[in-house]
């Protein structure tokens, strides 16, 4: 009986302590409300003295309340500083200092010696004599063959079919066990200008080989983040047969310039702007994001975009001279992670 009485008395003391803590919290909250309503803010030193640490408060409810107040005070100070800075900039007008640029990995990129200068004579000579010169001189028109690895599954097949609706004058062919070395001569004999091979692993597309015909080069990409049309939310209607516009972003080095020209050679020269379709290859930190959109003109001044799909991400693994040759091919560039990925601010495209 004595033990039961001790337990009841201890539980009664705990309940009294909880009530006292709750009353203290209510009084503190009421005092804060009165202070804010009267327009007089409590001094910061009284609320948060020097060396004050919220983590030292043992009462959980009290600690949570003080942390909430501290966050509110931080937001108010930040907003007040932003308003003050805005007023100062408006008062200075044109004499206001430029806005500070936030530091990002992109604008802190390590300078690459192979960065392309459009006015460089050497670059102009290379463009006039490389494998894509006949396309850019409008001597040839693109004709693309899209194929897969052996025994493709449904997801890879649907990706090929949807790519054929994005790239004009492209044809889907199922290999049926035929080796790539035998496919390439047949493509050249039938005047195909490019060959696209989509590889898969565990029923998921994971690689893309792009070979420019008849003389190369051949690029091998890792493919990830594949989304088919049905998997894209708020997508538009299926694309039309109009020739899309092509946008290439941030291909700045000599290697990136070659990859950009390779993508450009997949599409015909004169886009049909009436179709309002655009294919984008956006390079960011050596990842190439592919998107296919349609322009939506809401008014004379406002325009939006509507994604049509598919979408995927590419990362260059190697660039090989000539057509596909896995044994004796000469490689211009190969990605070596241990040697090349030594800095997060160094990019190759």
Curated annotation (Swiss-Prot):
Subcellular location: Nucleus, Nucleolus
Highest taxon of the lineage: Eukaryota
Region span, RNA-binding: 303-320
Pfam families, alphabetized: Brix
InterPro entries the UniProt entry points to: Brix (IPR007109), IMP4/RPF1 (IPR044281)
Biased composition (Basic and acidic residues): 87-97
Keyword terms of this UniProt record: Nucleus, Ribosome biogenesis, RNA-binding, rRNA processing, rRNA-binding
GO cellular component: nucleolus; preribosome, large subunit precursor
A GO molecular-function descriptor: RNA binding
Region entry Disordered, spans: 1-105
GO biological process, one term: maturation of 5.8S rRNA
SUPFAM superfamilies: Class II aaRS ABD-related (SSF52954)
Brix domain segment(s): 142-325
Role this protein plays: May be required for ribosome biogenesis.
The protein's name: Ribosome production factor 1
Native source organism of the sequence: Pongo abelii (Sumatran orangutan)
Gene: RPF1
């Amino acid at each position: 009986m004595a033990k039961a009485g001790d337990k009841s008395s201890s539980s009664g003391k705990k309940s009294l302590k909880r009530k006292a803590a709750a009353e203290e919290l209510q009084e503190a909250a009421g005092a804060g409300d009165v202070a804010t309503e009267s327009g007089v803010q409590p001094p910061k030193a009284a609320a948060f003295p020097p060396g004050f640490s919220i983590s030292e408060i043992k009462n959980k409810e009290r600690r949570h309340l003080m942390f909430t107040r501290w966050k509110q005070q931080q937001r108010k100070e930040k907003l007040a500083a932003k308003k003050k800075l805005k007023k100062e900039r408006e008062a200075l007008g044109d004499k206001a200092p430029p806005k500070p640029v936030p530091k990002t990995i992109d604008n802190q990129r390590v300078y690459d010696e192979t960065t392309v200068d459009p006015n460089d004579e050497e670059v102009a000579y290379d463009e006039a004599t490389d494998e894509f010169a006949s396309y850019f001189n409008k001597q040839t028109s693109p004709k693309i063959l899209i194929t897969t690895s052996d025994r493709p599954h449904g997801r890879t097949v649907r990706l090929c079919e949807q790519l054929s609706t994005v790239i004009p004058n492209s044809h889907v062919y199922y290999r049926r066990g035929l080796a790539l070395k035998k496919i390439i001569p047949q493509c050249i004999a039938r005047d195909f200008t490019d060959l696209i091979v989509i590889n898969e692993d565990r029923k998921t597309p994971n690689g893309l080989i792009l070979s420019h015909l008849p003389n190369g080069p051949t690029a091998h990409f890792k493919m990830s983040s594949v989304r088919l049309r049905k998997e894209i939310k708020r997508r538009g209607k299926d694309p039309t047969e109009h020739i899309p516009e092509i946008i290439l972003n941030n291909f700045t080095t000599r290697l990136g310039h070659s990859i950009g020209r390779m993508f450009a050679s997949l599409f015909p020269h004169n886009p049909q702007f009436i179709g309002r379709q655009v294919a984008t290859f956006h390079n960011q930190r050596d990842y190439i994001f592919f998107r296919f959109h349609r322009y939506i003109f809401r008014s004379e001044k406002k325009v939006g975009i509507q994604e049509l799909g598919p979408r995927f991400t590419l990362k260059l693994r190697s660039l090989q001279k000539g057509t596909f040759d896995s044994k004796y091919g000469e490689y211009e560039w190969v990605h070596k992670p241990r040697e090349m990925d030594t800095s997060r601010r160094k990019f190759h495209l």
